[in-house]
């Protein structure tokens, strides 16, 4: 196990990484600082299909240590620049806080005498389409140290692995030779989460300070805008599409839509109204299938009750953030009673 091997010789491993990152070759003579000996290793790839098909990538343990070091130093600096209502992968924020915040806005819009509308923005294959050149330009505006930029570029543009997809192509259907080297971020990297927020902060700032949108909220690439005039909202959409195309080199997909604010708003796995936050049907379906699978393993004697209980408790913890009285009763009737009887 590479993790245990690294930890067993932690001091030596850290010194080795330090030397590679600080440009000293083995003979102790300083080398060219722009040609350090640190290179990102090869990625391990894994296909996952829930909640949707994706390629998850993982680096070796030493490379993850380097990522963590840069993340700890850089993320707090960039986080200060983010807007209040950006909720993805930030300390003290998350899906629950994002849903709760949006729900406080919905009554203000749906109760007004003037009809409000909701713009739901969905960026096509966001993590697979981030442009490396654009990302480096954004980073270079805030980071002046060329040595740090050089190492970040190695994380962003890996010479051994392509992260990008051609427009309109699904990851599970893309041939290896068709993957793109100058686009995309590896799903699974800690730094990818940071870069994803930094990249779309350009859109956040544009919407808040140029378009003066008050009710704007984002969780990664899931974005909601509330606005009191439908025609003006179409104009806002056109301005956003222009920025995405000309400056960020991104596109919106067909899920992008404008709907009346009195209809349930779909956001981060939920249907949100002024009175309820309901778990999306697809999420409920996956949850029931998983519980049914776990229940079958338990009844066949293939897993212990502790494993079943842990799964059930995790789902109960998830459900408590939704308006889900009937759903909770159904789970208890369908699964918990039978499982506890069998235990």
Regions found by a protein language model. Give the residues of each.
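Surface-exposed helix-capping loop/turn segments at secondary-structure junctions
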Residues: 27-32, 80, 209-215, 248-252
């Amino acid at each position: 196990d590479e993790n245990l091997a690294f930890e067993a010789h932690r001091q030596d491993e850290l010194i080795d990484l330090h030397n590679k990152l600080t440009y000293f070759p083995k003979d102790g003579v300083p080398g060219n600082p722009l040609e350090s000996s640190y290179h990102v290793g090869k990625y391990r790839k894994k296909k996952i299909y829930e909640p949707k098909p994706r390629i998850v990538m993982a680096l070796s343990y030493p490379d993850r240590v380097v990522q963590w070091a840069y993340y700890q130093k850089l993320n707090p600096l960039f986080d200060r620049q983010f807007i209040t209502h950006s909720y993805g992968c930030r300390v003290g924020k998350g899906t629950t806080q994002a849903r709760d915040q949006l729900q406080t806005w919905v009554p203000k819009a749906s109760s007004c005498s003037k009809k409000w509308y909701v713009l739901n923005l969905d960026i096509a294959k966001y993590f697979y389409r981030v442009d490396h050149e654009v990302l480096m330009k954004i980073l270079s505006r805030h980071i002046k140290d060329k040595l740090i930029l050089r190492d970040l570029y190695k994380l962003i543009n890996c010479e051994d692995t392509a992260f990008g997809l051609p427009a309109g192509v699904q990851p599970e259907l893309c041939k290896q030779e068709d993957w793109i080297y100058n686009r995309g971020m590896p799903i699974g990297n800690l730094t990818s989460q940071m870069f994803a927020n930094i990249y779309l902060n350009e859109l956040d700032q544009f919407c808040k300070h140029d378009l003066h949108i008050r009710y704007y909220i984002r969780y990664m690439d899931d974005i909601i805008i509330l606005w009191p005039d439908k025609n003006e909202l179409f104009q806002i959409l056109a301005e956003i599409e222009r920025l995405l195309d000309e400056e960020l080199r991104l596109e919106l997909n067909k899920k992008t839509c404008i709907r009346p604010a009195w209809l349930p708003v779909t956001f981060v796995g939920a249907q949100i109204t002024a009175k309820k936050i309901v778990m999306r049907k697809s999420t409920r379906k996956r949850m029931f299938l998983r519980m049914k699978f776990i229940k079958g393993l338990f009844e066949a004697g293939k897993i212990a009750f502790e494993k079943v209980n842990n799964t059930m408790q995790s789902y109960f913890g998830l459900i408590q953030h939704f308006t889900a009285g009937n759903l909770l009763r159904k789970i208890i009737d369908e699964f918990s009673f039978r499982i506890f009887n069998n235990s």
